[in-house]
Amino acid sequence: MKKKIEFVYLGASGWCTTCRTINPLFTKEAQRLQELHKDTADISYVCYDIEDDEKGIELVEKYMVKSIPSMLVFVEGEFAEKVTGSAIPKKMEGFV
C-alpha cells in the first residue's frame, strides 16, 4: 500500500517576495517527488494564496500559521508538521 502524503503551501503572492520565490520551487519539488516515488507514495500538493483564498485563510487559522511562506504536511490524512520559510523545498523529501 502506498504512503499517502499531502503538501499544502500557504503564501501571499501580492506582497511576499519570499513567497514568490519559494512557490515555484515548492511546486517543482512536489512534482519531482511525485515522479520519483510514484510506486511507493501517493503524493499530492496544493498552493493557497492567503490573501484571497478562503480555504487558505481557514488553514492559517486552524493550524496557527504565524509566518509565510509555510507548508503544512499531512501523512495518511493526519497533520504531521508545519515548515516555514526557505527550508520548505529542502524538507519535503524527508516526509516521503
What are these regions (language model features)?
Residues K38-Y45:
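A generic structural motif
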Residues M1-L36:
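Local sequence-structure signature of Cys/Sec-based thiol-disulfide redox active-site neighborhoods
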